[in-house]
């Protein structure tokens, strides 16, 4: 927990009960808008998979999965998922989705080797989504348009929450800034670390997509 920062004398604006209500409110708002704008259908995701299935994402290849044996299946080993990157593609085919359609899910996972801080935890609770597009649509313009759509959903969610909770301020800029990793390197040639370059571009553009 060396990287967790809690300001001195920090006091939350909501108590624990109301925080849970607010979390549900923001999640409901965001996922409904996202599903509508991107033509996504909610599906249930696995918490664990067969390690021999090839469906567990090994992330960087060094993270150790949490595994356990299943008594009813003669001690067969199952692994808690790291992410759903591979499973989503499998599910799109399994559920029979068509071009222009997609799925989203509320994923839970355990990443035992995660370096924890204010935004990272060994317990993962995040949205995952994937949709089918044509080969012709696999281009930078489709990517940018999709990012803009997601960003608009974020802004609408922010606006909704700012109306519902008066202490929440709208801080997201109207537009999102796009830059490639090569362009970042050209802008900051004296900065060797990619993460540092991303940090510096964030100082110039608070909403950006690399």
Per-region residue spans from a language model:
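Class II aminoacyl-tRNA synthetase-like tRNA-binding/catalytic domains
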Residues: 2-120, 128-132
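Conserved small/polar residues in nucleotide/adenosyl-binding loops
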Residues: 205-210
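Extended, charged alpha-beta segments that form solvent-exposed binding/catalytic grooves
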Residues: 105-194, 198
């Amino acid at each position: 927990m060396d990287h967790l920062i809690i300001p001195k004398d920090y006091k939350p604006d909501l108590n624990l009960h109301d925080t849970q209500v607010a979390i549900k409110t923001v999640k409901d708002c965001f996922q409904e808008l996202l599903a509508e704008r991107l033509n996504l259908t909610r599906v249930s995701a696995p918490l664990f998979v067969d390690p021999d299935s090839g469906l567990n994402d090994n992330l960087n290849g060094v993270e150790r999965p949490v595994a356990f044996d299943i008594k009813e299946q003669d001690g067969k080993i199952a692994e808690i998922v790291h992410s759903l990157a591979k499973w989503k593609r499998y599910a799109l085919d399994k559920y029979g989705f068509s071009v222009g359609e997609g799925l989203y899910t509320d994923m839970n996972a355990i990443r035992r080797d995660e370096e924890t801080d204010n935004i990272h935890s060994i317990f993962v609770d995040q949205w995952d989504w994937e949709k089918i597009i044509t080969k012709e649509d696999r281009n930078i313009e489709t990517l940018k348009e999709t990012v803009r759509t997601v960003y608009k959903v974020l802004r609408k969610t922010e606006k909704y929450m700012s109306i519902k909770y008066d202490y929440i301020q709208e801080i997201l800029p109207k537009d999102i800034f796009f830059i490639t990793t090569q362009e970042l390197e050209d802008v900051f040639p004296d900065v060797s670390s990619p993460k540092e370059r991303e940090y510096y571009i964030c100082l110039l553009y608070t909403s950006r997509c690399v």
